[in-house]
Amino acid sequence: MNSHYQNHSLENFFSTNLSATDDAVFAGIQAEFTRQNEQIELIASENIVSKAVMQAQGTCLTNKYAEGYPGRRYYGGCEHVDTVEAIAIERAKKLFNCEYANVQPHSGAQANGAVKLALLQPGDTIMGMSLDAGGHLTHGARPALSGKWFNAVQYGVDKETLEINYDDVRALAVEHKPKMIIAGGSAIPRVIDFAKFREIADEVGAILMVDMAHIAGLIATGAHPSPLPHAHVVTTTTHKTLRGPRGGMILTNHEEIIKKINSAVFPGLQGGPLMHVIAAKAVAFGEALGPEFKTYIDSVIDNAKVLAEVLQTRGCDIVTGGTDTHLMLVDLRPKGLKGNKAEEALERAGITCNKNGIPFDTEKPMITSGVRLGTPAGTSRGFGAEEFKLIGHWIGDVLDGLVENPEGNAEVEQRVRKEVKALCSRFPLYQ
């Protein structure tokens, strides 16, 4: 190989692959790929990105510091990353039909933190959905910054319907007069009425923030009503149903708000943006603007309904009786099971999900009375209704086996794992 390097180690630095330079890390990555390829992923917050998104994230853009915003950077040499970030911003605005977008937050939690930094003061009252009802840590949960720096009031769900009771939300808002009301969550299977939330916010003079992280893909395709006509500010992750890289984003239609948001993201909360991730976000937004993405989201929702229906026939209780979205909560109490034990048994059988509290759960967060299931990742790899019927019955088999033997039913779990592996081999990843 011809080169001008005086030091041969530099030649290796620029040319040698990971497998040759760090076999320990390479082995870990390969093992994780095998796990993803051979198991069924039902964690509702996970998805599978396209090869193009993955390629964009693994580029030389990781080398570039770009503190600031396009056209207003603190470093030189940013003309090309400016172009990439501008593409991401314009595509995000088009995708969600809004006026302004900040694509720099490293995560959904960072996006939520930036909104609070921009629009609130420590000690202000905020109102968000409680964790046990389907909310998120960043919406005012005690262990999180949002629960420590602010006077956090939590709303829940109706004891009968297990859905949001907007009259109860209004009564709580009138009583506590929050500076900000947060709508959205991490385990809400039904459509959220953002217009009703805005009415309540206006009545008490509150800012309405919507966290659409879980349903951003549904909103992008019109499968769920958009919060943008109603919310003052909207946050989201860029993975989950949006099927992009792990990251966050903030959207608004208000110029005075985006100015505060931009200052809160940088220099308020973050330093240099991750330009390789922003490039991957731009690619994912471009994919989501195509007609294939709408077909994908429609299938995600259809598959979720199929899975919920099969589980109901197998004696599982689905919280709210079904789902309008990509996810469902399975109440395991009728089977006498705990969420942590069900999660472990399903993983032994090659099906990955997460234990999850259900509304009014009396179990501890690391135990729980339920599991949360979602269809985005399975749908991304090509599973349709017939495959999700099989998956529903496999879950039923594993849970019934666990009822018979609370320590795990090896015979059932090994049989299901073999069938899972055979199904996954028909829908391989990145071939």
Swiss-Prot record:
Protein name: Serine hydroxymethyltransferase 2
Reactions catalysed: (6R)-5,10-methylene-5,6,7,8-tetrahydrofolate + glycine + H2O = (6S)-5,6,7,8-tetrahydrofolate + L-serine
Location within or outside the cell: Cytoplasm
Physiological role: Catalyzes the reversible interconversion of serine and glycine with tetrahydrofolate (THF) serving as the one-carbon carrier. This reaction serves as the major source of one-carbon groups required for the biosynthesis of purines, thymidylate, methionine, and other important biomolecules. Also exhibits THF-independent aldolase activity toward beta-hydroxyamino acids, producing glycine and aldehydes, via a retro-aldol mechanism.
Any single Pfam family the record assigns to this protein: SHMT
Protein keywords: Amino-acid biosynthesis, Cytoplasm, One-carbon metabolism, Pyridoxal phosphate, Transferase
Enzyme class: transferase
Gene name linked to the record: glyA2
Assembly behavior: Homodimer.
Names of required cofactors: pyridoxal 5'-phosphate
Modified residue annotations for N6-(pyridoxal phosphate)lysine: 240
Taxonomic lineage from the root: Bacteria, Pseudomonadati, Pseudomonadota, Gammaproteobacteria, Vibrionales
Listed GO biological process terms: glycine biosynthetic process from serine; tetrahydrofolate interconversion
PROSITE patterns: SHMT
Xref: PANTHER family: SERINE HYDROXYMETHYLTRANSFERASE, SERINE HYDROXYMETHYLTRANSFERASE 1
EC number: 2.1.2.1
InterPro entries to which the protein is assigned, alphabetical: PyrdxlP-dep_Trfase (IPR015424), PyrdxlP-dep_Trfase_major (IPR015421), PyrdxlP-dep_Trfase_small (IPR015422), Ser_HO-MeTrfase (IPR001085), Ser_HO-MeTrfase-like (IPR049943), Ser_HO-MeTrfase_PLP_BS (IPR019798), SHMT-like_dom (IPR039429)
Plays an important role in substrate specificity (site feature) positions: 239
Superkingdom field: Bacteria
Annotated GO CC locations: cytosol
Binding site for (6S)-5,6,7,8-tetrahydrofolate: 131, 135-137, 256
Disulfide bridge positions per record: none
